[in-house]
Amino acid sequence: MSDAESTTEPWETSERLGRVEPSATLAIGNRAAALEADGVDVVDLSVGEPDFPTPANVVEAGKDALDAGHTGYTSSNGVPELKRAIAEKLRGDGIGASPEEVIVTPGGKQALYETVQTLVDPGDEVVLLDPAWVSYEAMVKLAGGELTRVDTAPSFQLEPALDDLREAVTDDTELVFVNTPSNPTGAVYTDAALEGVRDIAVEHDVAVVADEIYGQITYGDVEQTSLASLDGLAERTVTINGFSKAYSMTGWRLGDLHADEAFVGEAGKLHSHSVSCATNFVQRAGIEALRETDDTVQEMVDAFETRRDLVVDTLADAGVDVGVSDCAFYAMLPVDDDDQAWAEEAIAEAHVATLPGNAFGAPGYARISYAASEDRLREAFDRLFDHGLL
């Protein structure tokens, strides 16, 4: 070794990155992709991504925007017509929204990240409802926040856990995350539960993040109530949404947040200094998605509902109760106590990719996504049965 060579790592990275691990969802997806690259047929039930194409008219709107030269910067918070369309949708959900209260972001994840960075200082208390989407925890830790977790298992409904939430939230709590319709559980919280959140938030003067990205993917007579539509919550709620799930636009990267103008003014500083703006032509496609895709979205939702029934019925026939999801395209499958080992065996032996529940704060479960064809779902369960995993 020469004198010039160093025995230390070349980069001394920030302490904050040591607080988090890589995304568990992406890690499993990468492992599935590596197996497939080696010629292995993997049934991937790990990814939270619709298997339907982006609606054709939305794709055409994106192409038209490119042809029209919409390739430069936009106003940092988004093009006015898209913000108007988002505000119109929010008003339909009972939220008194104006375009000035909207920030358009490159994906719903960016909207969440900007919200946490805007509200959370080192040492601030943040409450999560478990099971919770994996990136909430990472975002809070990157901001230096301290987590308190409230378990909703085994029902995965918030209403039975309201007393636990009341105990968890104090005057020192800065923020509560509420994700309904829920990833990973497929639960839609009752109005009584949401009113309980409202009462707790008002009592302790706490801000609420309402992640409603699955709001258009609900089944039967189930309807989602937007938290910010409740009296007393509009002025303390940041509503997060995006285009990835309902419009099958995951790779387009388009999302949004809504809050009062005071919050938007502060969050807009971070937004402008970090991402400048969401991609111009993608925003134009988003306008088309909001205004001209109701029938296409409903067709996708109907297909997901059929798949949900297939999952529930197939597992019920084997004596496994996963409950009936009210929304999204996920089911929480009860497995051995060591869910990490179960998920690793499922992909290594059965070549079925799932996600261990511990990644969501739900040990003893695996999350399966039914954003896959009925044939592939049947194939996945056949493999899991054959390998003694069910």
Question: For each predicted feature, which ranges?
Answer:
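Short, contiguous pre-domain boundary segments
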Residues: 8-16
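Conserved AMP-binding/adenylate-forming core of the ANL superfamily
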Residues: 82-86
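PLP-dependent class I/II
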Residues: 2-8, 21-23, 28, 35-42, ...
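Short, surface-exposed loop/turn segments at secondary-structure junctions
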Residues: 73-74, 298
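Glycine-rich phosphate-binding segment of PLP-dependent enzymes
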Residues: 54-73, 87
